[in-house]
């Protein structure tokens, strides 16, 4: 009798049916959080069926944000959900695309590694996918082997692009044994208002399509805008041949952070533990319950304007908005997002109309010239009125451009937006010149991943972090032109953090006697924020916005700089509260 290999790691696959955007990523993340709260070591992976090697060159309107990992991989935004819910860093191996798989297989064929075989989807493509799935079960850098690997399969069952991934998942179950693999299928149960009925037929057809390729789901997540009654759950269990304990109703939740509670109420985590024969421990809700109290019982509300190019699609700034909300959780405050198209702030009147009722302005990252003058206009409006500002990546560059113009360089600009500008205060990084000129590939060639920075001891950012040695993730090709540092400093702007060699500007800020809170970073700190451990910069920024709202940082018009570029204030900013300890 054939025996399956002994495996210490269990694999759980999450697929989707009927429609896209049902929340597979959040479902997988929430289940991962529940298993982690049971004391298990969980890691996660996303299989994306598109032919792009990574999402780095994709339009944010089509794909949403690009989430950058510590090791510099440009990945799907769901990887951000995984990191936030698991509260641990993942690597580039957490995201696998069809483009990566085919590129690797074709490269192997060119090297002659297939010994003359005809290269086919089965077995060569599926074997490459299986290898990447099984690699997630290897011990981490500390030697710890995961108890569970949760793998989300992108797309919808029935899509041509997803078929190799589903076949690879089926083969993993065949190779490791059914007792070591669990299939979770997320499906839509639509409500028809005219008849007042919930319809189960789409889910039945979706499961039938899954079974036709050899996969029988162990559990079903029923997505609906309301609870699915027990009678319908029994019907679905019968028609789809799934245990009734594995039919899970997941109505829309008030917050994404409520989803673990929804799944736990339906006992999905206990069912998974039982089916995979995992160690049984009670869920430790201590940290998550504290988070939910902060989410649902805020003491006040603060309005933050996000001035960006892609505000029509909130997923384009997903990590930013979650980091802002987490900063609010720290202060027991609700952050109300005000989405402002950067084009609306190009004129003084437009900026006043868009920003007149907010308590803080966030300028996120981005690329291209469209909307840049609006971002600069928003910064000018905020600077002259004492309104707190946090600039991320491109946001730092816009703060620098606005400061340079205030210091007398009227034509100051970035080489990205105006190659012929007389004062390129933002210039192309030396190792990016050929790439920008078109002499090398654009994809995967930016300054990516975690880099260290050194902060000045008495700076706002050092007080926020509680240290002068920090590491943040990056994604950029342009930098502050060091030839203009002295001139820009005449505006009062301070270069408060640099790379360890002092060459690359990583942080800028105005001292509190010049402006209450304008801070910019060349990094993307939002990528390291967690709902239970908010990032220090977002804690400080939301705190400054709350001060502004309370009138402690007076929302009065600040005069333009004098001839020496510096305008002092009599009042000082409130000390920045110490954020929770970060690992």
Swiss-Prot record:
Extract the SUPFAM superfamilies matched here.
Class I glutamine amidotransferase-like, P-loop containing nucleoside triphosphate hydrolases
UniProt-recorded name of the protein: CTP synthase
Q: Does the keyword Lipid biosynthesis apply?
A: no
InterPro entries from the UniProt entry:
Class_I_gatase-like, CTP_synthase, CTP_synthase_N, GATASE, GATase1_CTP_Synthase, P-loop_NTPase
Purpose of the protein: Catalyzes the ATP-dependent amination of UTP to CTP with either L-glutamine or ammonia as the source of nitrogen. Regulates intracellular CTP levels through interactions with the four ribonucleotide triphosphates.
Residues of the region (Amidoligase domain) are 1-278
Regulation of activity: what does the record state?
A: Allosterically activated by GTP, when glutamine is the substrate; GTP has no effect on the reaction when ammonia is the substrate. The allosteric effector GTP functions by stabilizing the protein conformation that binds the tetrahedral intermediate(s) formed during glutamine hydrolysis. Inhibited by the product CTP, via allosteric rather than competitive inhibition.
Q: Which family does it belong to?
A: Belongs to the CTP synthase family.
Gene responsible for this protein: pyrG
Note the subunit structure. Answer: Homotetramer.
CDD domains, per this entry? CTPS_N (cd03113), GATase1_CTP_Synthase (cd01746)
* Binding sites annotated in the UniProt record for L-glutamine: 366, 394-397, 416, 477
Identify the residues that the record assigns to the Glutamine amidotransferase type-1 domain, covering every copy.
303-551
Report the pathway entry.
Answer: Pyrimidine metabolism; CTP biosynthesis via de novo pathway; CTP from UDP: step 2/2
Query: What's the superkingdom here?
Result: Bacteria
GO terms classed as biological process:
'de novo' CTP biosynthetic process; pyrimidine nucleobase biosynthetic process
Which reaction does this chain catalyze?
UTP + L-glutamine + ATP + H2O = CTP + L-glutamate + ADP + phosphate + 2 H(+); L-glutamine + H2O = L-glutamate + NH4(+); UTP + NH4(+) + ATP = CTP + ADP + phosphate + 2 H(+)
Enzyme Commission number(s): 6.3.4.2
Which GO cellular component terms, listed alphabetically, does the Swiss-Prot or TrEMBL entry include? cytosol
Additional comments on file? CTPSs have evolved a hybrid strategy for distinguishing between UTP and CTP. The overlapping regions of the product feedback inhibitory and substrate sites recognize a common feature in both compounds, the triphosphate moiety. To differentiate isosteric substrate and product pyrimidine rings, an additional pocket far from the expected kinase/ligase catalytic site, specifically recognizes the cytosine and ribose portions of the product inhibitor.
Chain residue ranges for the region called Disordered: 560-583
């Amino acid at each position: 009798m054939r025996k399956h290999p002994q495996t210490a790691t269990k694999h759980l696959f999450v697929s989707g049916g009927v429609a896209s955007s049902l929340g597979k990523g959040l479902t997988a993340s929430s289940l991962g959080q529940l298993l982690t709260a049971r004391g298990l070591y969980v890691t996660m992976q996303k299989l994306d069926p598109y032919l792009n090697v990574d999402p780095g060159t994709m339009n944010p309107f089509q794909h949403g944000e690009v989430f950058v990992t510590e090791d510099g991989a440009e990945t799907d935004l769901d990887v951000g959900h995984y990191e936030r819910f698991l509260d641990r860093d993942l690597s580039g191996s957490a995201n696998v695309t069809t483009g990566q798989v085919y590129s690797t297989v074709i490269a192997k064929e060119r090297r002659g590694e297939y010994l003359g075989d005809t290269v086919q989807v089965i077995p060569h493509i599926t074997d490459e996918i299986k290898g990447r799935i099984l690699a997630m079960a290897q011990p981490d850098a500390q030697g710890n082997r995961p108890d569970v690997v949760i793998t989300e399969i992108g797309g919808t069952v029935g899509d041509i692009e997803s078929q190799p991934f589903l076949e690879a998942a089926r083969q993993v179950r065949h190779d490791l044994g059914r007792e070591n693999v669990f299939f979770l299928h997320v499906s839509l149960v639509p409500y028809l208002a005219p008849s007042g009925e919930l319809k189960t037929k789409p889910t039945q057809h979706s499961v039938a399509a899954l079974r036709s390729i050899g996969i029988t789901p162990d559990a079903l997540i029923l997505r609906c805008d309301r609870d699915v009654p027990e009678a319908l759950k029994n019907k679905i269990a019968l028609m789809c041949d799934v245990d009734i304990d594995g039919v899970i109703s997941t109505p829309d939740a008030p917050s994404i952070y409520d989803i673990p509670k929804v799944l736990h109420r339906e006992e999905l985590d206990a069912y998974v533990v039982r089916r995979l024969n995992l160690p049984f421990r009670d869920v430790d809700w201590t940290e998550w319950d504290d988070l939910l109290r902060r989410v649902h019982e805020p003491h006040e509300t603060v309005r933050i304007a996000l001035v960006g190019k892609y505000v029509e699609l909130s997923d384009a700034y997903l990590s930013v908005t979650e980091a802002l909300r987490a900063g609010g959780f720290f202060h027991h405050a609700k952050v109300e997002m005000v989405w402002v198209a950067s084009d609306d702030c190009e004129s003084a009147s437009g900026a006043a109309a868009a920003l007149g009722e907010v308590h803080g302005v966030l300028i996120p990252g981005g690329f291209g010239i469209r909307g840049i003058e609006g971002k600069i206009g928003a910064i000018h409006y905020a600077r002259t009125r004492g309104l707190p500002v946090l600039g991320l990546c491109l946001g730092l560059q816009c703060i620098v451009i606005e400061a340079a113009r205030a210091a007398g360089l009227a034509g100051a600009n970035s080489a990205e937006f105006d190659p012929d500008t007389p004062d390129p205060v933002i210039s192309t990084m030396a190792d990016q010149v050929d790439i920008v000129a078109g002499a090398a590939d654009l994809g995967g060639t930016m300054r990516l991943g975690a880099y260290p920075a050194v902060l000045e001891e008495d700076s706002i950012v050092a007080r926020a972090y509680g240290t002068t040695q920090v590491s943040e993730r990056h994604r950029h090709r342009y930098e502050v032109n060091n030839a203009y540092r002295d001139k820009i400093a005449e505006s009062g702007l301070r270069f408060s953090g640099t790379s360890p060699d002092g060459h690359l500007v990583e942080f800028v800020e105005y001292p509190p006697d010049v402006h209450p809170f304008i801070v910019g970073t060349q990094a993307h700190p939002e990528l390291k924020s967690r709902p239970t451990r908010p990032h220090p910069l977002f804690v400080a920024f939301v705190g400054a916005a709350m001060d502004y709202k309370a009138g402690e940082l007076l929302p009065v018009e600040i005069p333009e700089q004098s001839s020496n570029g510096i305008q002092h204030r009599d009042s000082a900013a409130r000390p920045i509260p110490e954020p929770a300890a970060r690992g």
